[in-house]
């Protein structure tokens, strides 16, 4: 019998495969204001959060609440930030979509009213507000997909800070190691065909090849369930992986 493959080890849930969520700063969400009220806060710090690719801003609001919010480009410590229907249209302020002019870039857009923000939260990303209607607002996501949302959904004006992050090369393997460890991702990832036969169903042989069909049943036992799992089609034009 061969050794446990990595998928079986991951299933145990040891610290090697778990995200270090105890280091994450907070779950970011929009502060909810009253229907016609506008809340003002002061940015007191800009911090790094291991949970995400963008920096976060610590804001102290006039009502005494202090919370972390997603930091858009252009904000500075000491500036004020507004939340509400009458907030000024400037980076960092949060308004309902119905109050934001068309063509303005927005980030941390809510999918449902009150969910705190779901779209355009990664560093350097933003959504584009396309059209308004009485019952629906259309936005274009960074992927190019369009979404029809409620006009009451909130969004933050601006582009998420940290743009260009992926353009800087890692250069050293140690830098990549620290990035993956911060996210709880096992790295480096060794291909199955590069392993010995005892370590993986695709291992062994005089050259690197699976040595057997890569398609495998959905009900395959642990240790065999590798390759194209329950694939409808494989090969050219299919959805088969190259592993």
From Swiss-Prot:
For the biological process aspect of GO, one term held by this record is: cytoplasmic translation
Keyword rRNA-binding appears in the UniProt entry: yes
Please give the Gene3D superfamilies that the UniProt record associates with this protein.
Answer: 2.30.30.30, Nucleic acid-binding proteins, Ribosomal protein L2, domain 3
GO MF, any single term: structural constituent of ribosome
> Key word Ubl conjugation present in the record?
no
Residue ranges, annotated region (Disordered): 1-38, 198-243
PANTHER family from the xrefs?
LARGE RIBOSOMAL SUBUNIT PROTEIN UL2, RIBOSOMAL PROTEIN L2
Function, as annotated: One of the primary rRNA binding proteins. Required for association of the 30S and 50S subunits to form the 70S ribosome, for tRNA binding and peptide bond formation. It has been suggested to have peptidyltransferase activity; this is somewhat controversial. Makes several contacts with the 16S rRNA in the 70S ribosome.
Q: What is this protein called?
A: Large ribosomal subunit protein uL2
